[in-house]
């Protein structure tokens, strides 16, 4: 019988490359979360600054004058920051859960989810995968003889 050896790195799903990949996905999500939290804090501070609190003997129904252009620009920047932070959190969190790191992986998993199963034999294999497949085929062919 042919004695074929597989390394732990070739078989394990928890190899060094896998851990680095998952750490990169985690860091992307945490950076998006930090962006969202910072933009929420800035928006909250901006709202506190606009609050009109009259002093004693000042009218409480007459707010002080303000710039409409400045308010519109500030609202646009704060709204964009909140929307961008929330969207990136959703995208990177979903990719972290689904173990997606690249656009080709995303398109492959989306096609598989939609029911269009692509033939995996047409996909290119890396050298380690082809090595393992060849070794398994050798083992199976030797057992049949």
From Swiss-Prot:
It comes from Zygosaccharomyces rouxii (strain ATCC 2623 / CBS 732 / NBRC 1130 / NCYC 568 / NRRL Y-229). The keyword Transmembrane applies. Belongs to the AIM11 family. GO terms for cellular component: membrane; mitochondrion. The chain crosses the membrane at residues 26-48, 76-98. Its main location: membrane. It comes from the Eukaryota. InterPro entries: AIM11 (IPR038814). Keywords: Membrane, Transmembrane, Transmembrane helix. It is a multi-pass membrane protein. It is found in: Membrane. This is Altered inheritance of mitochondria protein 11.
């Amino acid at each position: 019988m042919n004695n074929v050896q597989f390394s732990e790195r070739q078989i394990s799903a928890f190899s060094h490359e896998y851990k680095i990949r998952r750490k990169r996905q985690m860091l992307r999500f945490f950076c998006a979360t930090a962006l969202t939290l910072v933009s929420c804090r800035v928006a909250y501070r901006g709202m506190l600054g606009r609050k009109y609190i009259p002093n004693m003997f000042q009218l409480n129904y007459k707010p002080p004058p303000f710039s409409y252009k400045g308010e519109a620009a500030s609202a646009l920047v704060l709204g964009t920051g909140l929307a961008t932070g929330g969207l990136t959190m959703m995208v990177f969190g979903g990719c972290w859960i689904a173990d997606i790191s690249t656009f080709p992986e995303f398109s492959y998993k989306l096609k598989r989810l939609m029911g269009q199963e692509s033939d995996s034999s047409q996909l290119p294999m890396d050298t380690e995968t082809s090595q393992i497949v060849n070794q398994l085929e050798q083992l199976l062919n030797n057992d049949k003889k």
